[in-house]
Amino acid sequence: EYKGRQTEYVDLIINEMIPMVAAEELADYIDVFCDKGFFTVEDTDRMLNAGMKYGLRAKIHANELDYSGGVQVGVKYNAISVDHLECMGEEEIACLLESETMPTVLPGAAFFLNMPYSPVRKMIQAGLPVALASDYNPGSSPSGNMKFIMSLGCINYKMLPEEVINATTLNSAYAMGVEEEAGSIAVGKLANFYITTPISGIEYLPYAYTADLIEAIFLKGEQY
């Protein structure tokens, strides 16, 4: 309906969709895909600004297809996370180093689309934290298997097992704004954890990428 009329569609989002979503308390975040062929930096700036006025925290999907400027506009609005990041240069890394925004990489999407992977080792060596997520969706990452995501982190990002576990737990909790209540086993936090079958060590989790190692799952202290 709005093909070729992107500005009008952005107006619709700002003037109708965001107010309705906020009024009905349907979302905590506003997430914009700022990338080549999708929303521009200017579009993204307008939508994040509108969402902020309604109390929606900014999140960004950006730099999957090109150096889009999405990282910079996300940091401008103190985005809780910027996701994808296959295209990352010195400018983007420096921008994130001066922010509280969590860089989140999505290896499942790069794997499924056969795209280049994010330069995670370069990001870590520069001093950035990194979160790992599945980007579970039917178009570009049709798997929510986080154990496989951990394996991809080790294989394709050259991350250590300890790094992928940290990236899928505490750093991922930070990327959702729930680090005070989840993401690690600590006094005062929710009892969210799983128990594995007997394994030789934590490095076996990403190593045995097709093995079903989960014996029990606990959410808020309740076993499922």
Predicted regions and their residues:
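Metal-coordinating catalytic core of metallo-dependent amide/deamination hydrolases
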Residues: 1-69
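Generic structural signal for hydrophobic
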Residues: 20-21, 47, 51, 74, ...
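Active-site-adjacent C-terminal substructures of enzyme catalytic domains
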Residues: 67-181, 209, 223
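C-terminal cap of metal-dependent C-N hydrolases
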Residues: 170, 190-224
